[in-house]
Amino acid sequence: MSESLYPSSTRELAQKRRELTPDTEAAFQSFSQKVFADGALSAKMKQIIAVAVAHVTQCPYCIKGHTKAALRHGASERELMEAIWVAAEMRAGGAYAHSALALDEIQKAAAAKSS
């Protein structure tokens, strides 16, 4: 038996969120609609960006939802995969860049030890 770590997103859960915080839910929905509307960036490009960011934030609901939205807006499989690779490189690059913090601490510890 396979049980998912994340429950399925259902109409019942969406309704419960609306019931618990209706004003906040409405504000978030309005914000989201405005963010993903065509502007300087097309809605398609915004959804591709969202797919990449969702992989960095590791939100399975966001990955699924924004992938579907990107496809609806005309994104290709190749565009989505390239965006995911950009996100992967940025995440790996961040880890690599932050190694400077560890190296700095190593140098401080070595200097303190030798004094």
Stretch-by-stretch model annotation:
Residues 44-48, 77-83:
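Alpha-helical scaffolds flanking conserved acidic
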Residues 49, 53-65:
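Short, thiol/selenol-centered motifs that function as redox-active sites or metal-ligating centers
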Residues 36, 40, 57-58, 75:
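Residues in soluble alpha-helical coiled-coils and helical-bundle/repeat scaffolds
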Residues 43, 57-60, 93:
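Short, conserved micro-motifs enriched in small and acidic residues
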Residues 25-26, 64-79:
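Iron-sulfur (Fe-S) cluster-binding segments and ferredoxin-like electron-carrier domains
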Residues 81-106:
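C-terminal structural segments of small proteins and small subunits
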Residues 32-33, 50, 67-71, 85:
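Amphipathic alpha-helical segments within well-ordered protein domains
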Residues 1-45, 97-115:
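Acidic, glycine/proline-rich low-complexity segments that act as flexible tails and inter-domain linkers
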